[in-house]
């Protein structure tokens, strides 16, 4: 299992619109091969910051399967306009 972690900085004032768009986008990612689960958490100190955690069966399920898919283009169209700057995405595994 691989855990994807993305720190999302949302343009200030667009937080609610982002959350609504994320609810629309969630079924896209949850239907992908290798997807296990995800969570989106809002920072309490900086309300324009969110932490997205996604669990995948393999790294390639995310980096090749999801990112190389037409579904990723839908995800991107719904969400990428909210990011400033574009998020750093890292992958972790349990030890």
UniProtKB/Swiss-Prot annotation:
Please name the gene that encodes this protein: yczJ
Domain annotation ABM: ranges: 2-92
Protein name listed in UniProt: Uncharacterized protein YczJ
Q: Which InterPro entries match?
A: ABM_dom (IPR007138), Dimeric_a/b-barrel (IPR011008)
Name of a matching Pfam family: ABM
């Amino acid at each position: 299992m691989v855990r994807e972690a993305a720190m999302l900085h949302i343009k200030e004032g667009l937080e609610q619109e982002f959350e609504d768009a994320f609810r629309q986008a969630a079924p896209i990612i949850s239907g992908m091969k290798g997807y296990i689960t995800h969570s989106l958490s809002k920072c309490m100190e900086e309300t324009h910051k969110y932490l997205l955690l996604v669990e995948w069966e393999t790294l390639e399920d995310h980096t090749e399967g999801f990112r190389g898919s037409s579904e990723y283009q839908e995800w991107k169209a719904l969400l990428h306009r909210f990011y400033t700057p574009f998020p750093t995405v890292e992958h972790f595994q349990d030890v």
